[in-house]
Amino acid sequence: MKTAVIIPSRYASARFPGKPLALLKGKPLILHVIERVKKCKRADLAAVATDDKRIFDTVKSFGCEVFMTPASCKSGTDRLAFAAQRHLKDYDIFVNVQGDEPLMDPALADLIIDSLKKNKKL
């Protein structure tokens, strides 16, 4: 079963516009999240789904897979679903990691993936 960890990311936050590109220790926040997700041992793909060209270009410049989604995607789950349906048809499992989780533990994503692979009803 092929597994993708998708990081939905948007620029137009009401409380903190541009948060994904805000610098944290000299790097954009979204890059910290990508680095954590890439440490997942069970994921076949780590990618970002965004509706913003600035985020798209930044993520691409760091060599990560990134998918452009329409602005009509109102939630991160909508962005993940769009990317899955449009670009990742041969994947079976999708894990949603929010773009503002720079301290996300990759082992937790691996546990989720293992659970999903073991229990086909989930």
Where are these regions (language model features)?
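Conserved donor-nucleotide/metal-binding helix-loop-beta segment in metal-dependent transferases, i.e.
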Residues: H87, L103-L122
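N-terminal glycine-rich phosphate-binding loop and ensuing alpha1 helix
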Residues: K2-A49
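Short beta-strand-to-loop acidic/aromatic patch adjacent to the donor-nucleotide binding site
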Residues: L80-A83, D90-P102
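A short, conserved beta-strand element in the Rossmann-like catalytic core
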Residues: R54, K74, P102-L103
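Conserved acidic residues
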Residues: T3, D44, D92, K121-L122
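Short, glycine/polar-rich helix-capping loops at beta-to-alpha or helix-loop-helix junctions
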Residues: T50-F56
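Conserved donor nucleotide-binding strand/loop of the catalytic core
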Residues: K60-G76
